[in-house]
Structure formats: structure tokens, C-alpha cells
Amino acid sequence: MDSQPQSKKAARGADKTARNPIPIIPAPTERLPKPQWLRVRSPLSPEVDQLKKILRDAALHTVCEEASCPNLGECFGGGTATFMILGDICTRRCPFCDVAHGRPEAPDPLESVHLARTVASMKLRFVVITSVDRDDLRDGGARHFAEVISALREHCPELHVEILVPDFRGRVANALAAFRETPPDVFNHNLETVPRLYLQARPGADYHHSLQLLAAFKAQHPQIPTKSGLMLGLGEEIDEIRGVMRDLRQAGCELLTIGQYLAPSRHHLPVARFVPPEEFQQLQRDGMAMGFRHVASGPLVRSSYHAERSFHEIGGD
């Protein structure tokens, strides 16, 4: 019998994190209980089922499903989603993330058209496009992003597009060149955590490189808002988070999301603590005082949560 390829489930769990520079010790069966403020309703509803059917018929993936987002029920129930392009297999092993690791397939040349037609059929006004890391591609997948933006604007002229990009490690010049003629309405790249925790939480990434990516895009497109996101609960100190926020402002970043980290499984990074809503509220005030144009900070906030609202609140047309 022929051997079967590694399953997505295996690539998500212990096999994914086993080779990280800082090993993940599986958490005990009993983990920190979720506080009441983190409890969300089940994502099972007719609206959710209908949107999943539309996505499957178009052979599309959403980060809402792949990353086990706690807001899936709310977003899908409202008929919206953040679309994930370039497949659902990542070349990185970030131990906080529930997206599968492995060897991805070649990009689908028809994906941009399929996605644009799907968005048009859903009559969406604002979409977020993200992707897995594609270290196997010369430009990290940037040209594919640009093709998707072009197709979306062709099929949906009134649509606004936010992209949430990987770090394009070692490929920044090629990546930014791809967006020169086809920039998004919002450029988002998440720093995720504080520099001290990068080796543990983002092996293969570099804090200063990510800052430089945001700064370089802003230098080329000063009129386009840049955005980043942070997770709390990995063992950081609040003053470290404030330091990252100041670094982001120096890089020209204008929009910020801050949310609670939730471990996808016992094989992922454990939650060090559940941050109370009051601390998120204080960080929101701190961020606005630093000069961010919009800060979404709360336990259930994720990078693309209410992305359309933040875009319009800062004057996006």
C-alpha cells in the first residue's frame, strides 16, 4: 500500500512544533479555564453553513476557519469573511498558529478570478485578503496578492481591499514592487508579540524586519493606512507592549489591533494569562494618545475584526 501524505491534523499539532528552536511542552489536560468575557456563541447557524458552502464551491479558504478564530460565528453569521489565498499550508512553524505546516502546492492561477466572483456574488463592500507564509516563492506570494487585488477591483469596483501580508523574509524589494501599481486600501502586517518572545513565538521571523516592512511600504505609499496586530497572554509585560506600540508609530503605522491569545491545542504555546478587559481598554487609550488613528483593543479582537469599521472611522471612502 502506498504511504499517505501527512494529514493536516498532524501538521497542525505536535509534528508542527516539534522542531522549533524552543520546544513546546504539551500542556496538561486541564488548561487555564476561560473567563466569562472570552465565551462566544457556537458558530453553528444557517448563515454560517451557507457561507461555508459558497466558499467550498469556489474552492476558497478563510483564515476564520483555518486559524480557528473565536469570532467565526459573528463574522460568518453576518455574511462576511477574511479570505486566505495561496493555499492553506504554511512554510513556517509558528507555535501560536493553528494553520497547518508543510510543503504547499503551487499557487492556483485561477484563484483571483474565483475569489473575485465569489465576493461579487456575496455583495461585499470590504474584504480582507491574507495568506500563509510562502517562503518557497521568489516574491513570497506578493504578485499573487496583486493579481487578487486587480481581479477584485475589476469585478467589484466599489470594493475596498485590506491585505494582511506575511513578512516576505528576504524578498521585501520584490514584494513591494508587486504592489507599486496595485496597492491595497489598507496594508496590514502583524508584529504579533514583543521582541523578547520572538524566538519562542515566531521562529523564522525577525521583529525589526517586520517593522521595516511596514515602514518601507508607508514610505512608498504615504497616503495608504498601515496596520498591525498584537496578541496578549504569551508572557509579555504590558510595558513591553507599549514599547512595541511606540516602535509601530515610529514606523508610520496608523491602525492597531490588540487581542487575547488563545492556544489552539495543548501542543501549541500555552496561554500564560488571560488579560482582563480593563487592561485592553487602557492600551486602547494609550494607543490613541501615541497618535494611532484607530485602536481596536479587547479580548476577542483579531486582526481583521471590524476591519471595515476602522477603515471608515479614519475617513476611508
Swiss-Prot record:
Q: State the pathway, as annotated in the record.
A: Protein modification; protein lipoylation via endogenous pathway; protein N(6)-(lipoyl)lysine from octanoyl-[acyl-carrier-protein]: step 2/2
Entry note: cofactor: Binds 2 [4Fe-4S] clusters per subunit. One cluster is coordinated with 3 cysteines and an exchangeable S-adenosyl-L-methionine.
Occurrences of domain Radical SAM core (ranges) = 76-293
Q: Does the keyword Methyltransferase apply?
A: no
For this UniProt record, the keywords arranged alphabetically read as follows: 4Fe-4S, Cytoplasm, Iron, Iron-sulfur, Metal-binding, S-adenosyl-L-methionine, Transferase
E.C. no? 2.8.1.8
Where found, per UniProt? Cytoplasm
Broadest EC class assigned to this enzyme: transferase
* GO CC terms: cytoplasm
Q: Which PROSITE patterns match?
A: RADICAL_SAM (PS51918)
Binding-site positions, [4Fe-4S] cluster 2: C90, C94, C97
Its cofactor is: [4Fe-4S] cluster
One Gene Ontology term of the molecular function aspect:
metal ion binding
What protein family does this chain belong to? Belongs to the radical SAM superfamily. Lipoyl synthase family.
The name of this protein is: Lipoyl synthase
For this protein's source organism, the top of the classification is: Bacteria, Pseudomonadati, Pseudomonadota, Acidithiobacillia, Acidithiobacillales
Name the gene that codes for it.
Answer: lipA
